[in-house]
Amino acid sequence: MRSSSKIKIDPSQHELVPKHEVLSIEEAYKILKELGIKPEQLPWIRASDPIAKLVGAKPGDIIKITRKSSLSGEVVVYRYVISG
């Protein structure tokens, strides 16, 4: 086994991983205003999460996750990026 070679896998290419995207400041403000909440009230995702790293999310960002659903077509959820 070679210690110098590492296998890199892109989890976003897996069919079960939904689309993740970092919202702009304007988009984040609009969503928070619509929901009537503060960013910290959203479910959290750590900046060290493989998908958060892949999309370049930093603590304080909000990630939009778009999932396909057999019952409701498409579901959009949001995550607040925390350190760690």
From Swiss-Prot:
Gene from which the chain derives: rpo5
Keyword line: Cytoplasm, DNA-directed RNA polymerase, Nucleotidyltransferase, Transcription, Transferase
Compartment(s): Cytoplasm
InterPro entries: Arch_Rpo5/euc_Rpb5, RNA_pol_subH/Rpb5_C, RNA_pol_subH/Rpb5_CS, RPB5-like_sf
EC number: 2.7.7.6
Function text: DNA-dependent RNA polymerase (RNAP) catalyzes the transcription of DNA into RNA using the four ribonucleoside triphosphates as substrates.
Protein name: DNA-directed RNA polymerase subunit Rpo5
Superkingdom of the source species: Archaea
Family: Belongs to the archaeal Rpo5/eukaryotic RPB5 RNA polymerase subunit family.
Self-association state and partner proteins as the record states: Part of the RNA polymerase complex.
Broadest EC class assigned to this enzyme: transferase
Keyword Nucleotidyltransferase attributed: yes
PROSITE patterns for this protein: RNA_POL_H_23KD (PS01110)
GO cellular component terms, A-Z: cytoplasm; DNA-directed RNA polymerase complex
Catalytic activity: RNA(n) + a ribonucleoside 5'-triphosphate = RNA(n+1) + diphosphate
Pfam short name (any one): RNA_pol_Rpb5_C
Listed GO biological process terms: transcription by RNA polymerase II; transcription elongation by RNA polymerase I; tRNA transcription by RNA polymerase III
Matching PANTHER family: DNA-DIRECTED RNA POLYMERASES I, II, AND III SUBUNIT RPABC1
GO molecular function ontology, one term from the record: DNA-directed RNA polymerase activity
